[in-house]
Amino acid sequence: MKKWTIEDSKELYNINGWGTSYFGINDKGDVYVTPCKNNTQIDLREVMDELALRDVTPPVLLRFPDILDNRIEKTWSCFKRAAEEYDYKAENYVVYPIKVNQMQPVVEEIISHGRKFNLGLEAGSKPELHAVIAMQCQSDSIIICNGYKDQSYIELALLAQKMGKQIFIVVEKMNELEIIAHEAKKMNIRPNIGIRIKLASSGSGKWEESGGDASKFGLTSAELLEALDFLDKKGLRDCLRLIHFHIGSQITKIRRIQTALREASQFYIQLHKMGYNVDFVDCGGGLGVDYDGTRSPSSESSVNYSIQEYVNDCIYTFVEAANKNDLPHPNIITESGRSLAAHHSVLVIDVLETASLPEMPEEFEPDENSHQLVKDLYEIWDNLSPRNVLEDWHDAEQIREEALDLFSHGIVDLKTRAEVEAMYWSVCHEIHALAKSLKHIPEELMKIDKLLADKYFCNFSLFQSLSDSWAIDQVFPIMPIQRLDERPTRNATIQDITCDSDGKIANFTTNRHNTHSLPVHALKKNEPYYLGVFLVGAYQEILGDMHNLFGDTNAVHISEKDGSYHIDQIIDGETVEEVLEYVQYNPKKLVRQLEVWVAKSVKQGKISLDEGKEFLSNYRSGLYGYTYLE
């Protein structure tokens, strides 16, 4: 057998496909991160070793702010190239919707590095608006106000505009326009009004229904005319400065984007012809991330275009439409939060233990005392060949079903059932190996791979850290971060530590294909085995829930410095005490209740005084400990 190489691991996990120059494998067989243009490699295994010395245990979220900076620069550079190519005469604005990742250190880094690119922020709720107004210090940076709005939301936005903020209030529903008009008159201010238009075009992928006629937000053509009439009556015609559209997140096909842009450009033209001098077009989100590295439009976890192609289409479509109609080029806004944030975070989890299906030892041979069903399965196993593999599979299935039925009726004993199951799984392993040599694998045999996978139990909560994996079956790149110079000899599904059967991952991307198991290595005694889950910087942190009361994980900020790495900040994960308080427990009261119970148990002689002290000490220290296993 050919010696396994690092190149084999690169191909197996397709790291060159989804890694987009940020991730790779070094000569030691460890995954590295290249956050900066200077190509400094940060070894993830070395990072985890240092964190272990500093008593920071998995699960841990590694954030690389330098990657955020690079994504901002890359997007801005793409706009600059497109503007030069198409002789674009207006301004483009990159806006970060903070709903993608509202964590303060993330937003702060985006604002800090985005300042020189005039990067703006988008708020989709009242709490988000409070954060955005306070953090966005540059008066010329754009703030987009989306989402449902009440009087206090609109009043806050208008007052901020009055004090110099460049705020656009985007109308989602007609009643919002009425509130804007009322509050603006009261404050004696000319509001910057935007209108979200409900396009007929829709996106593609998991969020396809976010756009089109069934979309949740936006005004139809008839409602738009009603809004224009209202603006005229209120003397606010000149205040309509922006149109906004959004056809869905993670759009997989560039053709859907092109269609939507053409439709939106006609709204821009028609409004100008009607005398509304709209000077901003907000193209919304949708710029996707290639999570599986395939660049395939048929995969819901991929995209078939680049950032440059997306930006080119945005600029070209409106330049062409404006030029044909002798209109000024609109200022173009994009809200590409997923593309900005996804790559900068890596979740590292450790494998606690494994479980695999039972198999008969190779030296096993049935004897005269063995049940006939065991003998029949052994005969199938002993005579397996590629020519009869499907028939043998059917026979093995029938024998197992018969054994389970006989056990349920009390006809065969537990020992026989165990032997039948072990022999059955031995047959399955052999059939799976033989099937790989077939030119055309029967569909029935394809499911064996899923059945035979080991279970790798990992120290994390799927619901807290990878919500989209559970909720919408989103595929994230997952791979070991070490031992990649060794051949992976096992295939496994990933199980979390929640008490929920949904807490598992059984959908992976390898070799440019989606599979139901992940190639992994057998565990070594007294050696940690880490798995990295990549591209988790968008939505996953903020969508996480506290199923089984597992809280936020440890988070570590790592930057490149002088050709190496520097740990800038360690943010401790939530403690047991903190998550109990979320669900309205009073930890101090819990301790007091236990003290009474323990004292009573000591008096009754159930435990000694020292045992009581030890129990209370363990309980108190547990309250201040990590919610995950340590």
Identify the residue ranges that each predicted region occupies.
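Short alpha-helical segments and helix-capping/turn motifs at coil-helix boundaries
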Residues: E7-S9, E73-R81, Q104-E109, L129-H130, ...
